[in-house]
Curated annotation (Swiss-Prot):
It comes from Xanthomonas axonopodis pv. citri (strain 306). NDH-1 is composed of 14 different subunits. Subunits NuoB, C, D, E, F, and G constitute the peripheral sector of the complex. PROSITE patterns: COMPLEX1_30K (PS00542). NDH-1 shuttles electrons from NADH, via FMN and iron-sulfur (Fe-S) centers, to quinones in the respiratory chain. The immediate electron acceptor for the enzyme in this species is believed to be ubiquinone. Couples the redox reaction to proton translocation (for every two electrons transferred, four hydrogen ions are translocated across the cytoplasmic membrane), and thus conserves the redox energy in a proton gradient. SUPFAM superfamilies: Nqo5-like. Belongs to the complex I 30 kDa subunit family. Its EC number is 7.1.1.-. This is NADH-quinone oxidoreductase subunit C. It holds the Pfam family Complex1_30kDa. The lineage of its organism: Bacteria, Pseudomonadati, Pseudomonadota, Gammaproteobacteria, Lysobacterales. It catalyses: a quinone + NADH + 5 H(+)(in) = a quinol + NAD(+) + 4 H(+)(out). The gene is nuoC. GO terms for molecular function: NADH dehydrogenase (ubiquinone) activity; NADH:ubiquinone reductase (non-electrogenic) activity; quinone binding. GO terms for cellular component: plasma membrane.
C-alpha cells in the first residue's frame, strides 16, 4: 500500500508542478494540500485528468485550540479529573473563555496549522482504485471563503451548505448557499470552537404568550463533561511524522 501511495504521490507532484501543493503520506493515505486560489482548478483536474469521479464527503474544520489539552496525563497523578483538569475552551468553566493553544505541563504542543479554517474533501477514483484527501485552508479567518465545486461534483451541494451552516465557511459560486441544519434565525455557527457548548439561547413554551419563545441561556451552568486529552499513542506516530514525509510540488 505504501509503495502504491508513493507512486501516486509522484504522479500528483508531476501533474501539479508550479502550484502551491503539498503531498503527504500519513498512515499510508495520500493527502493533497492546495492553496485556496488553486482549489477549484485542482479539483477539476483531479476529476478530468486523474479519474476522481466521486466526491464522497466534504467537511469544514476549525483548528482553533488545536494541540491543547485539558488534563495532564503525561505522568501518573494522584489527582482525579475534578481536581486535575484545566478548562481551555469556550464555556467549559466560565463564559467568555477563549480556546487556548497551550498544553499541560509535560506535554508537547502540536504544530499549529497554517490558518484557522480548512475545507477537506474525500475523493474516490473507481477506475484506479484510489482514494485521495484534498485539504484547503481559507485565507481569511474573519470571513473564510473558498470556491464552490458544485459544478465539478454536483453531489457536494449539501455538504458545502452544511460546512457553511456549522462553520461559517462561504463557498463562492454555490447556487443556493443557505443553512441546512440549524433553525430559522439561528445566530452563529455551532461547530466553531468559540461557540458556547450549550448555545446562546434556550427554548421554552410561554403560557402567557401561548407560543414557543427564545431566551438567553440561564438554566445551565458551564461544565466539562469529557476532558480533551492528548496522549502519546503509537497509532498517531505516523501523523506526527507527516511533515517529514511531505513534499511540495515544484
Amino acid at each position: 500500500m505504501a509503495e502504491q501511495a508513493s507512486s501516486f504521490t509522484d504522479r500528483l507532484a508531476a501533474r501539479f508542478a508550479g502550484a502551491q501543493i503539498a503531498v503527504a503520506l500519513p498512515r499510508g493515505e495520500v493527502t493533497l494540500e492546495v492553496a485556496a486560489a488553486d482549489w477549484h482548478a485542482t479539483c477539476l483536474a483531479l476529476r478530468d485528468e486523474l479519474g476522481f469521479e466521486q466526491l464522497s464527503d466534504l467537511c469544514g474544520v476549525d483548528y482553533l485550540g488545536y494541540g491543547s489539552d485539558e488534563w495532564d496525563t503525561a505522568d501518573v497523578s494522584s489527582q482525579g479529573f475534578s481536581r486535575g483538569v484545566e478548562g481551555k475552551a469556550v464555556g467549559r468553566f466560565a463564559w467568555g473563555e477563549f480556546p487556548s493553544q497551550e498544553s499541560s505541563a509535560g506535554a508537547q504542543p502540536q504544530q499549529l496549522p497554517k490558518q484557522r479554517f480548512a475545507v477537506v474533501a474525500q475523493l474516490i477514483s473507481y477506475q484506479h482504485n484510489q482514494r485521495l484527501r484534498v485539504r484547503c485552508y481559507a485565507p481569511d479567518e474573519q470571513v473564510p471563503v473558498v470556491a464552490s465545486v458544485t459544478d465539478i461534483w454536483p453531489g457536494v451541494n449539501w455538504f458545502e451548505r452544511e460546512a457553511f451552516d456549522l462553520f461559517g465557511i462561504v463557498f463562492d459560486g454555490h447556487p443556493d448557499l443557505r443553512r441546512i441544519l440549524t433553525d430559522y434565525g439561528f445566530v452563529g455557527h455551532p461547530f466553531r470552537k468559540d461557540f458556547p457548548l450549550i448555545g446562546n439561547v434556550e427554548v421554552r413554551y410561554d403560557d402567557e404568550r401561548k407560543r414557543v419563545v427564545y431566551e438567553p441561556v440561564t438554566s445551565v451552568e458551564p461544565r466539562v463533561g469529557v476532558p480533551r486529552v492528548i496522549r502519546d499513542d503509537a497509532r498517531y506516530e505516523t501523523a506526527a511524522g507527516e511533515v517529514g514525509k511531505s513534499e511540495t510540488a515544484k
